[in-house]
Amino acid sequence: MEQNVGYVVQIIGPVIDIRFESENLPAINNAIEIHFDGKKLVAEVAQHLGNDTVRCVALGSTDGLRRGVKAIDTGGPIKVPVGRGTLGRIFNVLGEPIDNKGEVVASDYWPIHRSAPSFEEQVPAVEIFETGIKVIDLLAPYAKGGKIGLFGGAGVGKTVLIMELIRNIATEHGGFSIFTGVGERTREGNDLWLDMNESGVIEKTVLVFGQMNEPPGARMRVALTGLTMAEYFRDVEGQDVLLFIDNIFRFIQAGSEVSALLGRIPSAVGYQPTLANEVGALQERITSTKKGSITSVQAIYVPADDLTDPAPATTFAHLDATTVLSRQIAELGIYPAVDPLDSTSRILDPRIVGEEHYYVARTVQQILQRYKELQDIIAILGMDELSEEDKLIVYRARKIQRFLSQPFFVAEAFTGRPGRYVKLKDTIRGFKEIIEGKMDHIPEQYFYMVGTIDEVYENYEKDMKGK
């Protein structure tokens, strides 16, 4: 087959204009290969200008590129390796391994631009996705094939929570995880890789990175690379896959960096006019089908803590559950530092989770909310000024707060406590016993950093016998 060859006519930062023969214009989203100075640069067609020119976004650095260089149309979108051969490996946006471990034995190569599953293929059934983490399963449960937003500032434990989820999926569910680093720090990616190697989770995980130092084209597309690898496990192997995207805001940011160079007029706050469309194209592909599911956990950076900013606001519309990590809770030494009153879930509904789960979760939230209201009074007047009923609420709330903490498997090396996976029924039973007053005789310190309620009993009985 004869190659379709064009020539570079203009370069503006990461945006390249290439002239082809007018009857051979490459299609939108086609990958174009440019070879110069012994390097290979891949660009993606974004627009057709006039009769014979295409405007492309470079997925690598355009340093040293000049006009007149030959460009070859590959005839299709970027294709990335998929299948079991990708497990335990690290890839870049083009699906090339970057871990110096040799070639990848791929089952197939799939294009990164694919259409979302049709209505017929999607599964409307809503099922709870057990994570084994008490605070999440009880108060903001994840839906199988749902999308979860993980909100949190620096250093409150987003990455540790993500690693624990990856570990629990691999060990308890035997499932695969895809981790996509979008525009985040390379150091964090390195830490994650080293930690995963130590904990042995790496064998069930694929890592895809397009970090802060990459050009905007790469950061814009790397989420699609990770998603395509996840789709293979869902559609061909029938797996329930976990897809982590850290950070979805950087995906939007990269789109906005390129947008102006493509000649688009910016919209609100300088974002790209195609913002909702770009986010939708990514999010609509993350769903459950009749074959399997992709459950995604997306870390979301909130610019200047403003939730009404167009980037987080657009993402919110797609989420089924939000897990908010709070610095105040982390300061109390309660990990995971999930805010039990701020985190929400669409499936916390008696028709989906059942009456008992719904009742226990809402009662726990009521007790914690009342405790929050009483804290000012306690700070000024002390506990003695409270009514007997309020005193009881405070005692129970403090036990609940401590019981929401849990030792993680991935943090064993730091805490010295063995990790715990708590089944949903044990979680519900434990909190039910606290709110019904069956645990009123046990001091609150016994509830801190344990798994099930049985462990609280055991430790208490043991200490009583010792005395």
Swiss-Prot record:
InterPro entries noted in UniProt: AAA+_ATPase (IPR003593), ATP-synt_VA_C (IPR055190), ATP_synth_F1_bsu (IPR005722), ATPase_a/bsu_AS (IPR020003), ATPase_alpha/beta_chains (IPR050053), ATPase_F1/V1/A1_a/bsu_N (IPR004100), ATPase_F1/V1/A1_a/bsu_N_sf (IPR036121), ATPase_F1/V1/A1_a/bsu_nucl-bd (IPR000194)
EC number(s) stated in the UniProt entry for this protein: 7.1.2.2
Catalytic activity, as annotated: ATP + H2O + 4 H(+)(in) = ADP + phosphate + 5 H(+)(out)
Membrane topology field: Peripheral membrane protein
Subcellular location, principal: membrane
Pfam families for the chain: ATP-synt_ab, ATP-synt_ab_N, ATP-synt_VA_C
Keyword ATP-binding recorded: yes
Entry's Gene Ontology cellular component terms: plasma membrane; proton-transporting ATP synthase complex
UniProtKB keywords: ATP synthesis, ATP-binding, Cell membrane, CF(1), Hydrogen ion transport, Ion transport, Membrane, Nucleotide-binding, Translocase, Transport
An example Gene Ontology molecular-function term: ATP hydrolysis activity
Protein origin, superkingdom: Bacteria
Cellular localization per UniProt: Cell membrane
Positions annotated to bind ATP: G152, G153, A154, G155, V156, G157, K158, T159
Quaternary data: F-type ATPases have 2 components, CF(1) - the catalytic core - and CF(0) - the membrane proton channel. CF(1) has five subunits: alpha(3), beta(3), gamma(1), delta(1), epsilon(1). CF(0) has three main subunits: a(1), b(2) and c(9-12). The alpha and beta chains form an alternating ring which encloses part of the gamma chain. CF(1) is attached to CF(0) by a central stalk formed by the gamma and epsilon chains, while a peripheral stalk is formed by the delta and b chains.
Similarity annotation: Belongs to the ATPase alpha/beta chains family.
Protein role: Produces ATP from ADP in the presence of a proton gradient across the membrane. The catalytic sites are hosted primarily by the beta subunits.
Name recorded for this polypeptide: ATP synthase subunit beta
Provenance organism: Caldicellulosiruptor bescii (strain ATCC BAA-1888 / DSM 6725 / KCTC 15123 / Z-1320) (Anaerocellum thermophilum)
Protein encoded by which gene: atpD
